[in-house]
Each structure stands twice: as structure tokens, then as C-alpha cells.
Amino acid sequence: MGAAYFDQFKVVDLIAITNSSMMMMLAVAVALILLKGNRLIPNRWQAVMESIYDHFHGLVKDNSGPQYFPFVFTLFIFIVFLNILGLFPYVFTVTVHIVVTLGLSFSIVIGVTLGGLWKFKWNFLSILMPAGAPLALAPLLVLIETVSYISRAISLGVRLAANLSAGHLLFAILAGFGFNMLTTAGVFNIFPVLIMVFISLLEAAVAVIQAYVFSLLTTIYLADTIVLH
């Protein structure tokens, strides 16, 4: 029974491409459909999206510059739609796979590093040596800062996959428990229904929060390297 909870994370080949690839394409398609079209008088959905847009625009502009806003906002939309789609029954959740999340995080850190080297040349390596530190401690500090810099990519990807995996497992266990209570106590017992509704709302909140944290940390890493804070 316990092994069945992990079957939702299994990568399956479908028509020469995996379910993981199909979900990524579906997330992009759904995002394009839901985000297209602007009305002069916005409806509630457009008002929510404009609020999110304004928030991210201000966040990225203040920390790393407006030129990076399209990338960070697109990253947030992509991850949040992947996370939300994964909440539906029998839908594969791409972001629970460490290979996918580490691929995203390492691509971001490598891209940021190359951008910093292109902009600052060898002066970019000054981020590995804290300002005002004693010269005698330079070898140790450079080693520590190098390990810390590399660990950014690892922690960024692992955090997303681990939190979503734990949430989905908890959701599956409690949903199964609630369904058993529902069939045992009768359809008029509201308690198991409330359990499933609460867990669903909690998982939706976690899906959005984790996408936001991933995008926020990406913005911070951009600020630390591109602006050389």
C-alpha cells in the first residue's frame, strides 16, 4: 500500500515522449490561453494577474533591474502552473522530480554566473572574497564562499522538489483516509469532506508559495551576482 503513494511520481513513456514533457507543454499551453487578451475594464482574473505582474515588476526592478523581469515572471508563471496542474487527479506533477528542479536551478545559476563574468570579467570573482576580510584568511574564505555559491543551485532545486513531494504524499494519505471515512460513515458525514477540502486548499497555497520562493531566490541570486552586492 505504501509503495502505491509513490506511483504518482513515476515517469512513463507516452508516444515517444514522457508524461513529464507532456505536462510541461500542457502548462505552457494553459498559461498562454489563460493569460491572453487584455480588457480595458479588467475582470477579476485579469485584476489578479495584473496585481501579480505589478508585484513582480517592482520586486525585480528594485533588486536586479527591469531587464530581468520577463525572465523571472515567466519562470514564476511556468512553475506555478506546473504545480497547480499537478493537484488534479491522475495528472503528473513535473516539479516533484529532482532532475527537473535541479535542471532549472543549475541552468539559472550557470546563466547568472556567465552573465556576471560577461559584465564584470574577472572582477566578478570578487564575490568569493568578502570585502574587508583579512588577507591571511583568503584561501579559507574563498573555499567557503565557493561551496556556498555552488550550494545555491542544489538548495534551490531540492527545496522545490522536496516540499512538493512531501505535500503530495501527505495529500494522498489524508485524501485516502478521508475517502475511507466517507464510505464508512456515510455520504452525509461532512468531516471527511472538510478534511479533503482543507488539504486541497493547503496544497494549492503550497504550490503558489513554492513557485514564488523559487522566483524570489532567483531574483536575489541575480542581484548578488549581476549587481555584485
Curated annotation (Swiss-Prot):
It holds the Pfam family ATP-synt_A. The chain crosses the membrane at residues 14-34, 68-88, 98-118, 124-144, 157-179, 189-209. InterPro entries: ATP_synth_F0_asu, ATP_synth_F0_asu_AS, ATP_synth_F0_asu_bact/mt, F0_ATP_A_sf. It is a multi-pass membrane protein. It comes from the Eukaryota. PROSITE patterns: ATPASE_A (PS00449). It is found in: Mitochondrion inner membrane. GO terms for molecular function: proton-transporting ATP synthase activity, rotational mechanism. Its main location: mitochondrion. One of its GO terms (cellular component) is mitochondrial inner membrane. Keywords: ATP synthesis, CF(0), Hydrogen ion transport, Ion transport, Membrane, Mitochondrion, Mitochondrion inner membrane, Transmembrane, Transmembrane helix, Transport. Belongs to the ATPase A chain family. F-type ATPases have 2 components, CF(1) - the catalytic core - and CF(0) - the membrane proton channel. CF(1) has five subunits: alpha(3), beta(3), gamma(1), delta(1), epsilon(1). CF(0) has three main subunits: a, b and c. This is ATP synthase subunit a.
